């Protein structure tokens, strides 16, 4: 039997459709919820991924509910590994949206991310999504550093190659009211509350 679990929120993705005579309110852009599912038996060998310790419990609960055989390892490194960081950009001008896909993480990661974030914001982007691979341990204080740059955890997503990536969002100074989001499943509401708490850490 298929089992579904809310795995990611994608916030402020594109503008609502305009209707004559109808006035919008806060959250003038659409946000999306994504779900993962195990459509068959769960006999595949367990796949392990690295996750920040702070998100291990919520990620484990997502995989457990979806009955997907993934183990979340919360090992952390004292600091970022040597080497240069590579982040690929996929800018969608019509949405004022950008995907920042991390290809490699080196000691200059946060400097590179800060520069790219400032550049896209100055060129009209108002929402940035950061896609981070889970094939290596994260450095201690990873999320705290991302929070300082305005990025906050929004979930996890499967990639085409069968791997998993963490998703972080930066609303680039947009006001956002999580109370306006309406969900009809307990796990989606729980994920929304979790993401809201992460968002609020960027405001401190």
Give residue spans per PLM region:
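Terminal substrate-recognition subdomain of acyl/acetyltransferases
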Residues: 1-110, 114-140, 144-204
């Amino acid at each position: 039997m298929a089992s579904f679990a809310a795995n990611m929120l994608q916030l402020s993705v594109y503008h609502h459709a305009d209707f004559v005579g109808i006035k919008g309110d806060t959250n003038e852009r659409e946000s999306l919820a994504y779900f993962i599912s195990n459509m068959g038996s769960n006999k595949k060998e367990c796949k392990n991924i690295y996750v920040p310790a702070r998100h291990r419990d919520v990620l484990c609960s997502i995989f457990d509910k979806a009955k997907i055989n993934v183990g979340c390892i919360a090992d952390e490194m004292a600091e970022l590994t040597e080497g240069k960081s590579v982040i690929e950009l996929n800018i969608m001008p019509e949405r004022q949206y950008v995907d920042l896909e991390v290809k490699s993480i080196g000691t200059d990661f946060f400097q590179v991310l800060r520069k790219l974030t400032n550049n896209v914001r100055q060129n009209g982007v108002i929402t940035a999504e950061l896609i981070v691979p889970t094939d290596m341990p994260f450095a201690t204080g990873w999320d705290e550093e991302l929070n300082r740059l305005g990025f906050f955890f929004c979930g996890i997503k499967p990639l085409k190659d069968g791997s998993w990536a963490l998703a972080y969002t930066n609303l680039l100074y947009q006001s956002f009211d999580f109370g306006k989001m309406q969900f009809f499943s307990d796990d989606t509401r729980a994920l929304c509350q979790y993401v809201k708490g992460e968002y609020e850490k960027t405001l401190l």
